[in-house]
Amino acid sequence: MFSEIQTIPDAAAEIKGSPEFPKIRGMVYFFGVHNGTIVAADIRNLPDGNAFHGFHIHEGTCQGTKAEPFAQADGHYNPTNAMHPQHAGDMPSLLANDGNAFLIFYTDRFHPEDVIGRAVIIHAHSDDMTTQPSGNSGAMIACGEIREMKTE
């Protein structure tokens, strides 16, 4: 599977922090493979240094207001109406070390084309994987809209 991530990703999201956390930056890449997707995330300047942060694909976009920066992100991407943590958009929490996080995993819950136009959200706290409907992971502190990567 590592050969797939040495190619141009099918989709990507540029992550930017909320006004409260403007230094958060990163990229999330989506590579279509076999019957699913490899997701690779590289995030910098997360708060709290060494902590877990909820990491989800949401139905909507990163649009919002100054008071609610990502108000239009809506709920977790959940095309099958599953219970949390079985939403298609439920991804493993990010573990920050010195404010930096790197994560790579495979999922068969979606293909890259299914999530184009949706939002990747990073939350202030870890997803407890229990609380309904979304894991009690706190405020949305960073967001990136998933865009198709064009190949020539």
Label each PLM-derived region with a short phrase.
Residues 1-152:
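N-terminal leader/targeting pre-sequences
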